[in-house]
From Swiss-Prot:
Keywords: DNA-binding, Ethylene signaling pathway, Nucleus, Phosphoprotein, Plant defense, Repressor, Transcription, Transcription regulation
Keyword rRNA-binding recorded: no
Taxonomic source organism: Arabidopsis thaliana
Gene Ontology CC terms: nucleus
InterPro entries: AP2/ERF_dom, AP2/ERF_dom_sf, DNA-bd_dom_sf
Comment, domains: Contains a slightly degenerated ERF-associated amphiphilic repression (EAR) motif, which may be involved in the activity of transcriptional repression.
Domain of life: Eukaryota
DNA bind region: 26-83
Protein name as it appears in the record: Ethylene-responsive transcription factor 7
Annotated region described as Disordered, given as residue ranges: 136-156, 181-209
Pfam families: AP2
Biased composition (Low complexity): 141-152, 192-208
Function according to Swiss-Prot or TrEMBL: Involved in the regulation of gene expression by abscisic acid, stress factors and by components of stress signal transduction pathways. Transcription factor that binds to the GCC-box pathogenesis-related promoter element. Part of a transcriptional repressor complex including a histone deacetylase.
Residue runs in coiled coils: none
Amino acid sequence: MRKGRGSSVVGPALPVTAGGSVKEPRYRGVRKRPWGRFAAEIRDPLKKSRVWLGTFDSAVDAARAYDTAARNLRGPKAKTNFPIDCSPSSPLQPLTYLHNQNLCSPPVIQNQIDPFMDHRLYGGGNFQEQQQQQIISRPASSSMSSTVKSCSGPRPMEAAAASSSVAKPLHAIKRYPRTPPVAPEDCHSDCDSSSSVIDDGDDIASSSSRRKTPFQFDLNFPPLDGVDLFAGGIDDLHCTDLRL
């Protein structure tokens, strides 16, 4: 049984001189010194001068130093002695990776804020209903009768609108122009201890009982002579028991 031959790598044939000695290959940018070392240098296209790269023990090391300098000066169009090495040890791979990463990165979009817009969170639903709710919650003008209710906490309608606006997704946010401010003379609010006040022209009527003139006497002093306590009528007299 015949065995197959193993694969072998055959190097390039070196030129041979007439005397039988092997001629060393010549590399771009490499010169051999008389004492046996190899010097590498390259021409700078911008400065129009030669740049010294150093002295090496072998011609291959000097040729690789020239190739590295040529790629740094001329880029991918540089003429080199050896093809570009695609292995991870290549010094040009990190630069190529960073360049590709910058090209693939998306551009940064800056959100420009318009100072003339009122950024309110309006939902993507019916905007007219929200305007009607604002008109109802706003007090009417002085020409029309209105009821102003005094309260210490936030209005339930506004609280519900705020909670619904926060619950809406971000893609449903819209911007609308700022509503004009209401003039202070368009609304009148006379709030005191009474629950509600009705303003109808010059006639102001309170839902609570009208204020009545107090009796002209003081409980801290004895009754005065000549003062009619029942001048306002018996209906206005309210008896109160004082207990000490």
